[in-house]
Every structure is written in C-alpha cells, then in structure tokens.
C-alpha cells in the first residue's frame, strides 16, 4: 500500500511555479503531452505534476535548484512525471479490465495511510485535496484510482509471492556471511538477519520483479501516445529491460 500512496502523493497537487515565482507554461498548455487509451494529460497538467515532484523533493530531501537550472530541472521532472502517469494509466486499465472493485472501506484504509504520509509534510488529507490549482475533484479521482490499482496489484502480485524455508535459510546464511566480511569493529552489521527482515527483503525483491513484469505485459494491451517524449511510447522507454 505504501507504494501506491507515495505514487498518488507524487502525481497530484502543487502549484506550477518556477524560479522567481514566474508561472511557466509551454507554448500550448492545452495540447496533449501524454495519452493512454485516449485518456489525455495536457502539457499544463504535466507541468503541475512535475512541479509536485520538485516541491516534494525540496520539502523532504532538501533539494536545492539554482534559478538558472530550473528549466533543466523542470524538464527532468516533467519526463519523470510522464513516466509515472503512463505507469498509473496502464495499471488502471488493467485493474478496470480485471473487474476488481475498490470499496468505501478500501478507500478509508488508504486515506488513513495517506494521512500518515502527509503528516510529515505538515498537511492533512483535506488540506492536500484542496490546495493548489488542480481541482479538488481531480485529486480525489486520482486517489480513488490509486486505491483501485493497489487492490489489483495486491491480488495479482502480493498474494502470489512464494516463499520457501530453504530460500529463507540460504538468504539468512548469505547475509550473515556478508556481515562477517563487511562489518568493522564497533559498527552495527549492515544487514538484518532476523526472520522478519529476511522475509521482507525477499518479498520486496520478488514484488519488484513481478510488478515490473505485470506492467510490461499490460503495456502491450494499451495504446500509448506521448508527443512530449516519443520514446516513452515504447515499453522499454518507460521500463527498460534488465
């Protein structure tokens, strides 16, 4: 759930302000930047989402961008936001096609998780939904979509991740050997080797692989057009092969 909530927080909200407080629009802010199965994200909306990522990095990671570097930074984050939006739309289409439904209880649970994420940003969910130029109803729609995607990926991935006792034992042994080789006197070991930590490490690795494979499979079933970044019309542009 944490991954879906973080993605949701990154994709919506924020004011499209660039260095010096100047509003930055492209020449045609209403033109299509990205389209997935006919669902359109305009240049203006893409800039909003890119600025969200910049603002969050400034707030949470102390990102400092010199004013003269802002155009380059904005372009970097616009491209990242385009990728994130494509991933969201591809998985949303898959979730809708699968017939999975998000209930009011699902949304309530996700909202509680979002509240914890927002707390470190000194925001409540209501403040987050209402602030910025993006209409509140659009933000709430994005949130509901994130909940649906989370429920779909949990069903398709999390509940199907296999674990074996031998695999856990081997990973625990490997981590202990690494700790013995890399831990300096007086320092704590680099890797946790309790069963819970080892299980989580294996689970996360398998989840990441399965998530990526699911996305690449579903990408082939949608139509992606990206005038802003044409290379993102290919699955390898969004999710490069290993």
List the model feature ranges, each with a label.
Residues 101, 122, 162, 201, ...:
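Ordered, soluble secondary-structure elements with a strong preference for glycine-centered loop motifs
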Residues 126, 155-156:
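Amphipathic alpha-helical coiled-coil segments
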Residues 90, 148-149:
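Small-residue hinge/turn detector
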Residues 1-80, 186, 193-242:
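Short, low-structural-confidence N-terminal segments
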């Amino acid at each position: 759930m944490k991954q879906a909530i973080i993605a949701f927080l990154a994709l919506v909200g924020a004011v499209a302000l660039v260095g010096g407080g100047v509003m930055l629009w492209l020449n045609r802010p209403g033109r299509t930047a990205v389209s997935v199965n006919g669902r359109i994200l305009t240049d203006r909306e893409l800039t909003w989402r890119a600025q969200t990522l910049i603002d969050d990095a400034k707030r949470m990671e102390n990102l400092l961008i010199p004013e003269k570097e802002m155009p380059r930074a904005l372009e970097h984050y616009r491209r990242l936001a385009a990728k994130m939006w494509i991933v969201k739309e591809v998985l949303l289409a898959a979730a809708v096609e699968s017939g999975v439904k998000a209930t009011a209880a699902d949304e309530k649970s996700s909202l509680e998780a979002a509240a914890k994420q927002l707390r470190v940003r000194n925001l409540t969910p209501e403040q987050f939904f209402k602030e910025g130029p993006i209409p509140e109803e659009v933000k709430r729609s994005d949130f509901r979509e994130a909940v649906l995607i989370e429920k779909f990926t949990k069903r398709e991935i999390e509940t199907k991740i296999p674990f074996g006792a031998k695999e856990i034992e081997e990973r625990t042994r490997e981590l202990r050997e690494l700790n013995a080789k890399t831990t300096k006197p007086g320092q704590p070991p680099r890797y946790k080797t309790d069963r819970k930590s080892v299980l989580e490490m294996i689970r996360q690795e398998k989840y990441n692989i399965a998530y990526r494979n699911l996305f690449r499979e579903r990408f082939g079933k949608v139509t992606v057009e990206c005038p802003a970044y044409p290379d993102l019309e290919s699955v390898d542009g969004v999710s490069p092969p290993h």
